[in-house]
Amino acid sequence: PMSLTPLDISAQVVGLDPNRPDEEYTLTGQATIAKTRAEVLKVGLEPSEPDACPQVLEAIHASDNLVLGPGSWFTSVMPHLLVPQIVDAILESKARKILTLNVSGADETDGFSPPRHLEVIAEHEPRMRFDVVLVARGFAGPDPPLESFARTLGAEIFINELALRDVSSPHD
């Protein structure tokens, strides 16, 4: 676990009610957020500044490579960037920082382009920088906006085959 404190996750979303597509709603709970078809704008934790698990901080400091993703973008990947001690440890780390985008745009990020994944990171934690962004071929071909946005995060883009087989899950 990233924290020894029990945490609740919430998300600000739009598009939940088709009759009010621009109205914002707050959803709570990992399962609820993961299943929503609304557009997730922002996620948060309660408590908002939990202490990080000491073993997590030790692992970050001892790492040669830090890999964020793939996974459910808003409920598995982003929460790590909402714990201030974890963010500080990542920023202070000399490890190579690697961001792996999902192999498809399914689930919470349905309709998200690869650049949008990077924008979400920057919106939630503007100080975050990466050395490398890995993108699955087929999820993104040559994409000048993706390459440009990756450079703003300090990253070099690598587009390659990342899935071992045809999968429908964005995690594999």
Describe the role of every protein-language-model region.
Residues 63:
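An anion/phosphate-binding loop that grips the pyrophosphate of nucleotide cofactors and donors
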Residues 73-82, 144:
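Glycine/threonine-rich flexible loop motifs
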Residues 111-172:
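C-terminal functional extensions of proteins
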Residues 1-37:
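Electropositive, gly/pro-rich neighborhoods at or near active sites that engage anionic ligands
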Residues 41-57, 82, 116:
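Active-site glycine-rich loop that binds ribose-phosphate moieties when present
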Residues 17, 42, 46-50, 132, ...:
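Metallocofactor- and cofactor-centric catalytic cores in central/energy metabolism, strongly enriched
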Residues 80-87, 113-118:
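Charged helix-capping and loop-helix junction motifs
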